[in-house]
A protein has these predicted regions:
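Basic, glycine/lysine-rich polyanion-binding surfaces/domains
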Residues: 1-182
Length: 182
C-alpha cells in the first residue's frame, strides 16, 4: 500500500488509450483470500465457480476470483457485496485473518515489495521467475534487456530467501548473512 501512489503514476505513463483510466480502487474493492484443501468446496458453495488453473481469472456477480495456486484463491469483491460474501465464506471455512494469508504468501515464495525495497531487485532476485511472475517470451517492458541478460547469463547477484528469525524483524531491505553460507 505504501508503493501504490508511485505505482499508479508509473503505470499511467504506459496508458496509450483514452478509454483506460487508472485509479485507487481501495474504497470500491475488498480483497478476500480463500485457502486450504477446502477452498474449492467453499467457493462452489458460494456459487462463484473456481478458476481452473494457476493465474486463471473467473468473474462472478460479486467480483472476480483469481487462482493463485492449487489451494489459494484471491477474491476481489465489490465493496457493497463484501460483507455478505465474507459471512457466507465464514460459515463454510475458518476465518484466520491477514497474518495467516501473509504466511501463505511467504510459503508460496511471493515477495512483499515495500517502499524501502521498491526498484532494488530485478525479478530474478525476488524469485519471480520461479513462481510464474515474469515471462521471458511475452511482451515488452522497461528493463526487459537486463532481465533477459540476467536469465541467459545465469548470474544473479543476490536472491530472496525465506527465513525464520527469532526476535524482532530487521527493517525491510536489510541484507542478511549466514556464517555457514558465504
Amino acid at each position: 500500500s505504501d508503493i501504490q501512489p508511485g505505482m499508479l503514476k508509473k503505470l499511467g505513463m504506459y496508458v496509450l488509450r483514452s478509454k483506460v483510466k487508472l485509479s485507487d480502487a481501495n474504497s470500491d474493492i475488498v480483497l478476500l483470500g480463500v485457502a486450504g484443501t477446502g477452498a474449492a468446496a467453499a467457493l462452489k458453495a458460494l456459487g462463484t465457480g473456481i478458476p481452473s488453473s494457476q493465474y486463471d481469472v473467473l468473474r462472478f456477480e460479486e467480483g472476480t476470483a483469481i487462482r493463485l495456486d492449487e489451494h489459494r484463491i484471491q477474491l476481489a469483491v465489490h465493496a457493497n457485496a463484501a460483507v455478505p460474501v465474507w459471512n457466507k465464506l465464514a460459515s463454510l471455512a475458518s476465518p484466520v485473518g491477514t497474518p495467516a494469508w501473509r504466511w501463505l504468501e511467504i510459503a508460496a515464495g511471493v515477495p512483499h515489495i515495500t517502499l524501502a525495497t521498491q526498484e532494488e531487485f530485478v525479478p530474478q532476485m525476488a524469485n519471480l521467475e520461479l513462481i510464474g511472475g515474469v515471462s521471458f517470451t511475452k511482451g515488452c517492458y522497461p528493463g526487459q534487456e537486463i532481465v533477459a541478460r540476467t536469465k541467459y547469463l545465469g548470474k544473479v547477484k543476490r536472491r530472496t530467501y525465506r527465513a525464520h528469525l527469532e526476535g524482532d524483524c530487521p527493517p525491510a531491505g536489510t541484507d542478511l548473512f549466514s556464517p555457514d553460507l558465504p
